[in-house]
Regions:
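Conserved His + Asp/Glu catalytic blocks
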Residues: 1-169
Length: 172
């Protein structure tokens, strides 16, 4: 089972499966629906996985980047916090005591929002997961030779021929 969770930030999905194989299939199906940043092979994400009540469970949090602007800022806006996996799971690690004193729920929310994917990107993932393909209806045909065209590939007329008990398609 694959679920979308919208209670923490954008881009959070939860999967549940009874077997490792099912969990892997769901995970890769979800990953295939997300865009990878330019120059990268896969999307940015944090993954939390565990076993509970006889099933594998995973929480996937898609990200747009590794760090918020606060990490790169100078002066009072600077924070050494860099939301990692624990932070994206709700446990914020603050390495500098003075920064801890400056934190507020609004600031943490801003940091998480900055590194999370946008609502538009989340919508694209959901659309790719839930879209349906048009149904193809083909009647049963019988003849020694059938000529047809697949409109979407633009290759023109194709031919299937029955020869010596075998079907020959485009000469092969």
């Amino acid at each position: 089972h694959l679920y979308h969770y919208d209670g923490f930030t954008t881009g959070v999905f939860v999967l549940r499966a009874e077997t490792v194989k099912s969990a892997a299939k769901l995970f890769y199906r979800l990953l295939d629906c997300a865009d990878a940043p330019e120059g990268e092979k896969e999307p940015l994400f944090n993954l939390f996985s565990y076993w509970k009540d006889g099933e594998f469970r995973s929480v996937i949090v898609f990200r747009s980047r590794h760090r918020s602007h606060h990490y790169f800022s100078e002066g009072p806006d600077h924070l050494t916090m860099s939301p990692g996996c624990a932070d994206m799971g709700g446990v914020f690690i603050v390495p500098v005591e003075e920064e801890y004193e400056r934190l507020s729920p609004e600031l943490l929310e801003e940091m998480v929002r900055e590194v999370s994917i946008t609502e538009e990107e989340e919508g694209m993932i959901i659309n790719r997961l839930t879209r349906t393909q048009p149904r193809l209806h083909v009647g049963i045909m019988s003849a020694k030779e059938i000529e047809f065209e697949i409109l979407s590939d633009g290759a023109g007329a194709r031919k299937a021929v029955m020869r010596e008990g075998k079907i020959e398609y485009d000469g092969a």
